[in-house]
Amino acid sequence: MPVVRALLFDVQGTATDFFSTLCEEARRISPAPGVDWPDVVRRWRAGYFAALKDARAHHNGWLSVHSVYRGALDDVLEDGVLSVAQRDELTLAWQRLRPWPDVVPGLTRLKTAFTLATLSNTDVSALVNISKRAGLPWDAVFAAEMAGVFKPDPAIYRMAGTYLGLEPAEIMMVASHKYDLRAAAALGFGTAFVARPLEFGPGGAADVAYSAEFDVNASDFLDLAEQLGC
């Protein structure tokens, strides 16, 4: 059996805490009371997923995720809540997402034994900005933009494998979203589920149940590093 040589990481939700980041940015931009920002952020994220699902259903290929988030924000905000400039500024916060506390130390340990790369639906420019700002020590950055399709389309996983020069069995997908892992597993990739109970904030509906269908189930990146011998 081939030995895993590279790890691919989902970024939004798995490596970064978008919920807290966006809520804090929204309150900074609009300190006035009366807006339930946690609810807005949850519906905003759901609107993003709905837009990607619609794009896949209509075979529209890749769309700028920044533009998708910007449009989805207008859909969830009432008229008069934030100016156009403020909405533009808040959308840019998706490029300033903070990592979960375990991420940098966990990646640092994993990097001693594996090639580390992103495999994200977000734009390449956003990945670069997030990673540089947060000090995320990737060896490579792969994104849907490079494949022209969004996860879970098989083409995006194959694209990453081609760029890495590795067989699927030599690569492990790491994500907190099970649809992502199942798509990778169907192509022969290894899988590691990382539970993020606060992905949608306290009381959010994150799926954190471990499953035997995945090769590894971990509580965070440090636990993942421990289980992978780093």
Give the ranges of each region predicted by the language model:
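Structured helix-beta-strand junction loops
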Residues: G47, T112-A113, P137
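A metal-dependent, Asp-based hydrolase signature
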Residues: P38-D88
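Alpha-helical elements of Rossmann-like donor-binding domains used by nucleotide-donor carbohydrate transfer enzymes
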Residues: T21-R28, R43, G71-D75, E89, ...
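Generic structural signal for small/hydrophobic residues in well-ordered secondary structure
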Residues: D10-G13, L73, T118
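Active-site neighborhood of HAD-like aspartate-dependent phosphohydrolases
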Residues: M1-A46, D79
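Short, acidic loop-to-helix structural element flanking the phosphoryl-transfer center
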Residues: W62-R70, L82-T118, V128, P154
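Hydrophobic alpha-helical core bundles mediating ligand binding, dimerization, or RNAP-core interactions
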Residues: L22-A26, S30, W44-F49, Y69-R70, ...
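Asp-based, Mg2+/Mn2+-dependent phosphohydrolase catalytic module
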Residues: M1-R5, V104, T108, L119-C230
